[in-house]
């Protein structure tokens, strides 16, 4: 399965996933549609990058003037500092520079900066990109990269999957605008969910379902079904459950869901689990009903509902309030009642703090839910 690639990346610390240009373009364009000046006069930092290969650097450098950027900074991580060792391949862009050092290129990160017309053609674009070696290896946690973070206004990148939690903490410390790529299951992380609940982070626009294709190094093991090699020998894999996480506003975030009433759902829902029913399933350990599909949320229900985490793809903060994430310690904090001992005998996998309902005399656990409630003003 394609999502095996994500698990492999976490295990092997092989985080060299190169985001495709169209995926970057679609997301950034959505921000521009909502606010054409969102990047104007701003310094953009692209950390955790490989600028010689990266489509992030290519996109922002090619569109420097269109976006109205003040400065573009992109940093790379030293090859020998990576947990997953791959043969180092310097590009012509690197080797043709007089300050190129083959040994230093393996042990030091690099910084690429674009802020002025170097070529003299009266344009600022990718041809004006300049690079130098960093003092260190380019680790985003280093003082050197933190200083660049603090200089920036907006941070955009596809951070290492294995370090996503730590990267989010690093971002929050900066109080900067950001757009980063991660797996949808990161919604459940303790470093992430409180930000979503408090409307300090939300889902991006352009990726809502299915999988996405990423470029990978030549040495990446193609062990899953979702991969291909193009006519030039470049390798690609498909990864499921990918999302943009951002705090840059966009229009879709403010579009209320169009929903049917409870009665209409029972009569017209396309889901057999809903159509023909007389009521939604009620949880045993929390006063809420279970909604297994986002489009089955009843528009006229005033109480608390448990919805799939993918609801966040269509979440409108003016329409709904997020109550919490009822799993484990989060659930206990919300007041979910512990499981009776006799139920744990029926299902050894039960964990206090998780939502459940009864089905055929046995406890059933719905897959990852978020508790929400409709706002009265909508």
Positions of predicted regions on the chain:
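Class I S-adenosyl-L-methionine-dependent methyltransferase catalytic core
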Residues: 1-156, 160-378
């Amino acid at each position: 399965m394609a999502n095996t690639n994500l698990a492999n990346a976490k295990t092997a610390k092989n985080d060299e996933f190169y985001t495709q240009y169209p995926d970057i373009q679609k997301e950034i364009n959505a921000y521009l549609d909502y606010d054409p000046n969102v990047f104007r006069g701003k310094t953009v930092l692209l950390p955790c990058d490989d600028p010689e290969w990266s489509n992030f650097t290519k996109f922002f450098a090619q569109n420097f003037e269109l976006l109205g950027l003040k400065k573009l900074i992109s940093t790379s991580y030293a090859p020998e500092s990576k947990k997953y060792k791959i043969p180092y391949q310097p590009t012509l862009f690197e080797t043709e520079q007089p300050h190129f050092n083959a040994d230093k290129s393996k042990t030091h990160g690099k910084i690429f900066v674009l802020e002025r017309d170097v070529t003299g053609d009266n344009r600022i674009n990718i041809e004006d990109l300049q690079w130098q070696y960093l003092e260190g290896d380019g680790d985003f946690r280093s003082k050197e990269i933190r200083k660049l973070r603090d200089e920036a206004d907006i941070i955009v990148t596809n951070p290492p999957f294995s370090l996503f939690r730590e990267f989010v903490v690093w971002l929050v410390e900066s109080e900067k605008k950001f757009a980063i790529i991660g797996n949808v299951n990161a919604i459940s992380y303790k470093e992430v969910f409180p930000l979503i609940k408090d409307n300090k982070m939300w889902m991006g626009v352009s990726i809502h379902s299915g999988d996405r294709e990423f470029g990978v190094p030549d040495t990446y093991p193609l062990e899953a079904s979702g991969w291909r090699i193009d006519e030039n020998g470049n390798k690609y894999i498909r990864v499921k459950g990918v999302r943009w996480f951002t705090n840059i506003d966009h229009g879709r975030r403010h579009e209320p869901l169009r929903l049917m009433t409870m009665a209409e759902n029972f009569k017209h829902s396309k889901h057999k689990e809903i159509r023909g029913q007389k009521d939604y399933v009620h949880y045993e350990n929390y006063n809420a009903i279970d909604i297994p599909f986002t489009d089955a949320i009843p528009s006229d229900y005033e109480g608390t509902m448990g919805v799939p985490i993918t609801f966040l793809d269509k979440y409108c903060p003016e329409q709904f309030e997020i109550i919490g994430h009822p799993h484990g310690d989060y659930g206990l904090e919300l007041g979910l009642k512990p499981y009776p001992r006799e139920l744990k005998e029926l299902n050894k996998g039960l964990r206090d703090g998780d939502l459940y309902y009864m089905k055929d005399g046995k406890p059933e656990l719905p897959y990852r839910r978020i508790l929400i409630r409709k706002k009265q003003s909508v």
